[in-house]
Each structure stands twice: as C-alpha cells, then as structure tokens.
C-alpha cells in the first residue's frame, strides 16, 4: 500500500481524532470539524461492526506513526513474539522507531518531517549517521542532529514548537546541543489514552 500524500486534516477527520500529522500544537478540532467525516457536508458515519471498529483503530494507529500495512503487520508479529502484553509491546516498538524518537525529541515538527530528516542523513545515533526511519532505538542510545544540519531553519522551528508540548519522561533532550538520550522504553501510562491497542490485538488474533 502506497503512503498517503493527500490533505492531513482529511485523515484526522476520517478517524474522528487528532492524528498529530500537522506541526501546530493547537488541537486540530479547533481548526476543523473533527467529528465530521470528509466531504462537503460530512458523510454520515455508518454503525460499525466489531471488525470495523477494530480495523478503524488499526488504521488510526498506523497513520499516527506513518507505517505502511506490511510494516505494521510485521510489528505486530514481533510484538506477539516478545514477552509481556502484545498490545503494549506493539506500541513500544512503534515508539522506538528512529523517526518517532526524532519527533518526540522535538527535532522534527511532525513525524513526517522527522522521517525526512532521517532519510536526508541529518540524524546520528551514537555518533553514526543512520538514514533508516524504522531503525529501532535502544535504551541509552544518543540521538543527535548532524553538525551540518543544525543550522536548518526547520529544525530550529521544530525545537521552538516542542517547547510548547509536554516533554516525554522517557527521553532526555539537550535542545542547545540538539541531542537527546532515549533513557528507557515508554510505559503504557506514558502514552496516549486515545489509543486502544487491545482492539488491534483482537483484529490480528482472528
């Protein structure tokens, strides 16, 4: 499945929640009718079956993290192999992606922008350039902006935006040095309560 390149607000309206695809810190529901489906007047939402609800939740999480269908299924398979709660393992794997960590540290205004920084070789992990967005970050890894990329206006703008967001407790960021440490994997209580990972587990368990 190809990556969606259309209007970001349209995706959030389709899912009925803010997917944090735009760079602003103001909630999207203050910018558009988030509860109204895309279309001139908003299509009436049909009553979903249990399968439909599960599928919609999977699509929502997949879009939040910008992961393609095959990648997402592979993350689920890996999460199921790990010890512990499969749903929580899945979220931890998604949060551990390099592009997501770059976003969480405030170096990219959105996950899409963070992914672009990674692919353009502007990001280093433990002093080495890594240009794979799905690269898994481990506890105590140091993620930093490459020296020649530190002057980019988009990085500076992203750091200013990040000052207005709640800082993740599992990360330690030095905005001046443009580097941060992935102290630990996030716990479920650290992440959005708007995600129901149990629905995704139910979907893939069938």
Curated annotation (Swiss-Prot):
One of its GO terms (molecular function) is structural constituent of ribosome. InterPro entries: Ribosomal_uS4, Ribosomal_uS4_bac-type, Ribosomal_uS4_CS, Ribosomal_uS4_N, S4_RNA-bd, S4_RNA-bd_sf. It holds the Pfam family S4. GO terms for cellular component: small ribosomal subunit. The keyword Amino-acid biosynthesis does not apply. PANTHER family: 30S 40S RIBOSOMAL PROTEIN (PTHR11831), SMALL RIBOSOMAL SUBUNIT PROTEIN US4M (PTHR11831:SF4). One of the primary rRNA binding proteins, it binds directly to 16S rRNA where it nucleates assembly of the body of the 30S subunit. With S5 and S12 plays an important role in translational accuracy. This is Small ribosomal subunit protein uS4.
């Amino acid at each position: 499945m190809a990556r969606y390149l259309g209007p970001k607000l349209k995706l959030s309206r389709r899912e009925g929640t803010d997917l944090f695809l735009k760079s602003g810190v103001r909630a999207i529901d203050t910018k558009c009718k988030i509860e109204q489906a895309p279309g001139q007047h908003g299509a009436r939402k049909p009553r979903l079956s249990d399968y439909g609800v599960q599928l919609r939740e999977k699509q929502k999480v997949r879009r939040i993290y910008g992961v393609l269908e095959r990648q997402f299924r592979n993350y689920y398979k890996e999460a199921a192999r790990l010890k512990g709660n499969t749903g929580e393992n899945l979220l931890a794997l998604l949060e551990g992606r390099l592009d997501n960590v770059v976003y969480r540290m405030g170096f990219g205004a959105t996950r899409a922008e963070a992914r672009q920084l990674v692919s353009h070789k502007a990001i280093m992990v433990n002093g080495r350039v890594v240009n794979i967005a799905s690269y898994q970050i481990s506890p105590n890894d140091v993620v930093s902006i490459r020296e020649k990329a530190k002057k980019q206006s988009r990085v500076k703008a992203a750091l200013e935006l990040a000052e207005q967001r709640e800082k993740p407790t599992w990360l330690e960021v030095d905005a001046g040095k443009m580097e941060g440490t992935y102290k630990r994997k996030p716990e479920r209580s650290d992440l959005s309560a708007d995600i129901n990972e149990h629905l995704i587990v139910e979907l893939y368990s069938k």
